[in-house]
């Protein structure tokens, strides 16, 4: 029984990543550049809804030109995180430092701290343990 040669699947994302396993791409001998180019020609012949089809060549250009292929181009196409909402931003780390500083300054030597709750659990009352 003869098997047909595998053609590239039509269900690929516009970043050139195959929907199946990456092993399938290696088996057929396709490179990321060829996948992106075949996808590029496929999408140019079938226009998409709205104005996305006018921007599609500029979106695919990093995929075709970049040596690492779609993985790095996908990261490059992601929108930059807003510095005010980014959890690793400078503003958030400053706020954590201020909070830590306040916690240390508020707790004096004579002020009982939060370890009161764990001590009551350590006393061993069977009603609180599960």
UniProtKB/Swiss-Prot annotation:
Native source organism of the sequence: Homo sapiens (Human)
Cellular component terms per the entry's GO annotation: nucleus
Superkingdom of origin: Eukaryota
Mediates interaction with SRSF3: region residues: 16-22
Function: Interacts with the splicing factor SRSF3 and increases its binding to specific exons within pre-mRNA, thereby regulating exon-inclusion during alternative splicing. Does not directly bind pre-mRNA and could regulate a wider range of splicing factors through a similar mechanism.
Keywords: mRNA processing, mRNA splicing, Nucleus
Stated name of the protein: Splicing regulatory small protein
Main location: nucleus
Cellular compartment(s): Nucleus
Biased composition (Basic and acidic residues): 77-98
Gene Ontology BP terms: mRNA processing; regulation of RNA splicing; RNA splicing
GO molecular function, one term: pre-mRNA binding
Keyword Nucleus among record annotations: yes
Record's compositionally biased regions (Basic residues): 1-10
Positions with biased composition (Polar residues): 120-130
Subunit structure: Interacts with SRSF3; increases SRSF3 binding to specific exons.
Location of the region described as Disordered in the Swiss-Prot/TrEMBL record: 1-29, 74-130
């Amino acid at each position: 029984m003869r098997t047909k040669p595998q053609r590239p699947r039509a269900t690929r994302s516009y970043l050139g990543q195959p929907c199946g396993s990456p092993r399938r791409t290696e088996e057929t001998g396709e490179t990321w550049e060829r996948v992106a180019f075949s996808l590029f020609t496929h999408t140019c012949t079938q226009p998409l809804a709205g104005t996305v089809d006018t921007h599609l060549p500029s979106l695919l250009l990093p995929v075709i030109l970049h040596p690492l292929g779609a993985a790095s181009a996908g990261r490059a196409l992601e929108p930059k995180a807003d510095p005010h909402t980014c959890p690793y931003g400078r503003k958030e780390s400053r706020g954590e430092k201020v909070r830590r500083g306040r916690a240390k300054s508020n707790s004096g030597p004579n002020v009982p701290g939060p370890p009161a709750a764990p001590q009551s659990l350590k006393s061993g009352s069977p009603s609180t343990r599960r």
